[in-house]
Amino acid sequence: MTPKLSFLKTVAKKVMPEFAVGGYHFLMALAAAAYCRFPSRKIKVIGVTGTNGKSTTAMMIAAILTQAGFKVAVSSSIEFRIGGRVWKNRSRMTMPGRFVLQKFLRRVADENCRYAVVEVSSEGIAQHRHRFIRFEAAALTNLTPEHIESHGGFDNYRAAKGKFFAACRNIHVINGDDPNCEFFAAFPAVRRYVYGIRHSFSDRIGAKKITATRAEFSLGGSSFESEGVAFKLRLPGEFNIYNALAAIAVARSQGVPPEACRAALESIGTIPGRMEKVFAGDFEVLVDYAVTPDSLEKAYETARRGLAGKLICVLGACGGGRDRWKRPVMGHLAQKYCDRVFVTSEDPYDEDPDRIIQEIADAAANAIRITDRKEAIHRALAAAKHGDRVIITGKGCEDSMCLAAGRKIPWSDKDIVLEYLGKSR
């Protein structure tokens, strides 16, 4: 988005009454769907929403449906996919704008895909991007505080997610171990699936239960049993067991047998930028997208498992005045789990990067503050010894950094790591 367009949108939001803004978004959603001839009527669209795990869950669902013999498309914050063709999502948007998304679904329908798996964001829901899309199923990964300032509180954030479930009345897939389970279970659905590990969901919820037993996880992978089938994933962490269960529940709602789910999930080696091990030698280096306190804590917990040496982290926080509340929380988590902490810039937008760094580092007593992200990564790698583990969070597989005045520069945490280690060896 150009600086001029961004300015005009900001002014419009301030001068237009709230109902007019909502009406504008609704009409734009209708116009986009009509222009593209309502493509979702020709395909089955699976919507995946939640705070964390949407991209991984969407890719897991796509892998299972493909394994089952269907032609599948994906719209995620990582990539777009139609059958075997894949291209990177460079928009920095979890859920594309109305016309982009409807045009994508039109292509999906025209290329005879049976399914489209779409990430659904709270911002997208607030702007009616989900409207006039006929969703076969709505799946919830989890819900933790995020986008609090833009929504005006957690209850409003949860309510935004709820609008998606209210709009999709066919199949609902809900994380039964999430504290918000019963809120989402209250929305009417033809069929409801509840998944979990801890079996904490209430029997009052009328739903088919997809549960995991004998769940074990580490940085090297995870395993569990469900419906009498043993699953062994190469993806790390307990959070990926939850992501897998969500994907299994969606697949089972479409009649896919458990064995096909197992074969597909066990074939997934890595998800780009999601606890991705980019180097393994004397020490290990992980790159992860974690941008919320919940996802950051889970990443650190997983990274500490089986660790002989020290855990060294590089982290930042997004600028633009967004979710400032979480900056000290993330600094505290880094201090709690990591032996050495490097706080740096992430995507400052128009905000002073040094102020963002200060708000994080003030909660981490021994944090080293380095504004230049490349230098911070180099310093962390230089500090790593035999048996240590370095985890770099916040960017994942993103290929640009957002600076002031709408400027973007090419970026890759992974490439910076590999370039440095290649030169230092």
What name fits each language-model region?
Residues 76, 120, 176, 196, ...:
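Short loop/edge segments at beta-strand edges and connector loops
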Residues 1-9, 15-22, 246-273, 277-425:
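ATP-dependent carboxylate-amine ligase
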Residues 41-43, 109-111, 135-285, 308, ...:
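Acidic, Mg2+-coordinating active-site environments of NTP-dependent enzymes
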Residues 80-82, 124-126, 179-183, 201, ...:
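Short, active-site-adjacent cap segments at secondary-structure transitions
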Residues 76-79, 228, 269, 394-396:
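Short, small-residue-rich loop/turn micro-motifs
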Residues 51, 77, 175, 197, ...:
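Cofactor-binding loop segments of dinucleotide-utilizing enzymes, especially the Rossmann-like FAD-
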Residues 7-176, 182-191, 245, 251, ...:
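Phosphate-binding loop of NTP-binding sites
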